[in-house]
UniProtKB/Swiss-Prot annotation:
Organism classification: Bacteria, Pseudomonadati, Pseudomonadota, Gammaproteobacteria, Methylococcales
Top-level taxon of the source organism: Bacteria
Organism of this sequence: Methylococcus capsulatus (strain ATCC 33009 / NCIMB 11132 / Bath)
Record gene name: nqrE
Identification of the protein by name: Na(+)-translocating NADH-quinone reductase subunit E
GO cellular component labels: Gram-negative-bacterium-type cell wall; plasma membrane
Enzyme Commission number(s): 7.2.1.1
């Protein structure tokens, strides 16, 4: 149990997708103008990560990995070279399902997220979760914890960024830095804050 808690904390703080690896920055910057929208997208990312990382783990372990098709008598078959395409396909399917659910049951959130919901499909943070899982050879339960943790870490980062940007509206920012300029500086300072966790060994 301790190993799973350590993995969760590590994926949220020490190896934060947005502020340690700088993944998913397009949506991170674009959707962090309001806290409500940022929280909505953060929840969507947590759900997609929680579903796709374990799903890709099962597909990789039982179909794509070298020797995974031994149950079918194909002992020497190695399909790991199509792991990237398989991960993208699973992510696209999960996002499509999530989009239909939000459109049906949460139309306000669906309209608020707008074009950025389909962009979760090509959000590199989502894909990185599955690729890191394969690279680090996590088992199924570890991939569930890692999926939840990495999604929650990204959601935490975008929510914090939205809070900072809402406060910046009332600040006297120099004219040349207004808009994206001060946003990138704020993101960099937040990343420096998260660097404090990098020395922690779990």
């Amino acid at each position: 149990m301790e190993a799973y808690i350590n993995l969760f904390i590590k994926s949220v703080f020490i190896e934060n997708m947005a502020l340690s690896f700088f993944l998913g920055m397009c949506t991170f910057i674009a959707v962090s103008k309001k806290i409500e929208t940022a929280v909505g997208l953060g929840i969507a990312v947590v759900i997609v990560q929680t579903l796709t990382v374990p799903a890709n783990n099962l597909i990789y372990t039982y179909l794509l990995k070298e020797g995974a098709l031994s149950w079918a008598g194909l002992h020497d078959v190695d399909l790991s070279f199509i792991a990237l395409m398989a991960c993208i396909g699973v992510i696209a399917a999960m996002v499509q399902i999530l989009e239909m659910v939000l459109d049906k049951f949460f139309p306000a959130l669906y309209n608020a997220l707008g074009i950025f919901l389909p962009l979760i499909t090509v959000n590199c943070a989502i894909l990185a979760g599955s690729l890191f899982m394969i690279e680090r050879d996590y088992n199924f339960s570890e991939s569930v914890v890692y999926g939840v943790g990495s999604g929650f870490g990204w959601a935490l980062a975008i929510t914090a960024m939205a809070g900072v940007r809402e406060k910046l509206k009332y600040s006297d920012v120099p004219a040349g830095l207004r808009g994206l300029g001060i946003t990138f500086i704020s993101a960099g300072l937040m990343a420096l804050g998260f660097m404090a966790f990098s020395g922690i060994q779990l």
